[in-house]
Amino acid sequence: QMGLTLITADFNDLSALKQIIEAQQPDAALVQHTRQQPQDRYVLADVLATLRAAGVPALTDDNYAVMKVARIGCECGANVSTFSCFKLFGPEGVGAVVGDADVISRIRATLYSGGSQIQGVQALEVLRGLVFAPVMHAVQAGVSERLLALLNGGAVAEVKSAVIANAQSKVLIVEFHQPIAARVLEEAQKLGALPYPVGAESKYEIPPLFYRLSGTFRQANPQLEHCAIRINPNRSGEETILRILRESIASI
C-alpha cells in the first residue's frame, strides 16, 4: 500500500544482516526494539551500528520499550524513534516521533491541515501519560515480582512454575501441572479478568489480563499451549490476581 518492497533480515545474525545490505541495498530499515520471538537476542545498538555503517537510515519501533529502557532507538543510533502515546496511558490515535530534526520538520510539513494536527488537549493528555507511565510500570513490575515469588512458592498448588517474560509487555507465564489452560481462561473472564487487551498498557486496561500464549511462543513450544497462560497485572494487585486464579481453577 505504501509502494514499498519489503526486504527481511535476521537481526540476530549481524553477518547475515551485512550480506543482505550488500546484496539488496535497502533505502531504509525498520527495527523493533522489543523482541518478537523467544529466540530473539539481538542488541539494538549493534544492529543500528551495522545499518549506520552501511549508510542505511533506520527507524525504530519503540513501543513497550519507552520508559522501561535506558536508551530508546534514536539514542542508540537510529535516525528516528517512533511509539504510540496510547500505549503510555495517553490519548487514542496519537503517536510520537523523536530524532533527526530534518525528518521531524518534513513530518511537520505534511501536517499543515488543522484536521491532522494534534490539538492542545491531546498534547496535555500525552504529557500526563508520560509522567504517569513510569510510575505505573514500576508498580506493575512490583506486583509481577511478588506474584512470581508467591506462585513459585506454592501459593497455588495447581501451578507448576511461573516466569516473568518480556513478551513486549512484561508478563507472567504461568504453567500448570495439568493441561487446564483453556478452561482457566474461560473461567477467569467470568470472574472479572480481561480476556483480550484493548491496547496493551493503555489507560483503559484496569483489571488483570488472563490470556493465552502468543503465537510466536506457541510456535516455539507447542506443548505449552495447553498448560500455560499469560497474566498481565495491569492496575491490579497480587491478591486480586491470586483470587481470580484460585477461583478459576476451583470452578473447573
Region locations from a protein language model:
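Conserved PLP-enzyme active-site core in the AAT-like
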Residues: 1-137, 141-159, 186, 247-248
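Short secondary-structure junctions
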Residues: 8, 156-163, 191-198
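Short, flexible, solvent-exposed loop/turn segments with mixed acidic/basic and small polar residues
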Residues: 83-86, 159-165, 216-223
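Conserved glycine-rich beta-strand-loop-beta hairpin in the small C-terminal domain of fold type I
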Residues: 144-145, 161-173
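Conserved C-terminal alpha-helix-loop-beta "cap" of PLP-dependent enzymes
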Residues: 168-249
